[in-house]
Amino acid sequence: MFSKILVGLDGSDFSLKALEFAIDLAKKYQSQLVLVHVVMRQIYAINPPEAGVLAGTAIVRELEEDGKAILAKGEETLKAQGIPVETRLKQGVPAEELLRAAVDEKVDLIVLGSRGLSQVRAFFLGSVSDKVSHHAKCPTLIVR
């Protein structure tokens, strides 16, 4: 039923619960999982011009390293359980990148945590899970 499942990971407890749920589905349906972490493009807007380009570059590099670590931990968990896995580190607007990855990877299901961003950021950017669930071309499962 679900041969390929995309899981959005941001390191939050909610995204880890989503991963646990996706693992159960993968075991049941012998699915491959695609783990996706998105480094938010909005970080560029946070960095004031007077701070310099190098400071912004360092912040993005650190966020990318954090993302790689989140993906590596998820990949290790899945490989230990014999579940086929691929990882993707994206940069941009999280909902848009998750939707793009779902199409590019031809997934049958997207699994996301119900929350990940702080409430303040969610107010300004909107809920990633809400945007993905409304615009995805495949079923979306939101885990609480």
Which role does the model predict for each range below?
Residues 50-54, 104-105, 128-129:
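Short, hinge-like loop/turn segments at secondary-structure boundaries
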Residues 54-69:
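A short acidic, glycine-rich active-site loop
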